[in-house]
Amino acid sequence: MANSKSAKKRALQSEKRRQHNASRSSMLRTYVKKVIAAINAGDHESATAAFVTAQPIVDRMATKGLIHKNKAARYKSRLNAKIKALAA
């Protein structure tokens, strides 16, 4: 338990950040799941549309430090490859 005033403040800030990051992480997973669901359904148009909306979200989370920039690149690359495979 935090004893000093500054430690209490840091504990409050930490909890606030944890909740905020959890919310953003959930949002990221939701957008990625929408793309994956469209890919699994075999619908190229809706998969592309979902990917276009998910792409800036993934980039933003990488910028905010929620995920590593290489992980963001990996997400985008793999999803895009699956979408291209649908078109072929």
UniProtKB/Swiss-Prot annotation:
Residues 1-27 are annotated as: Disordered. GO terms for molecular function: small ribosomal subunit rRNA binding; structural constituent of ribosome. InterPro entries: Ribosomal_bS20, Ribosomal_bS20_sf. This is Small ribosomal subunit protein bS20. It comes from the Bacteria. The keyword rRNA-binding applies. Binds directly to 16S ribosomal RNA. It comes from Shewanella piezotolerans (strain WP3 / JCM 13877). Keywords: Ribonucleoprotein, Ribosomal protein, RNA-binding, rRNA-binding. One of its GO terms (cellular component) is cytosol.
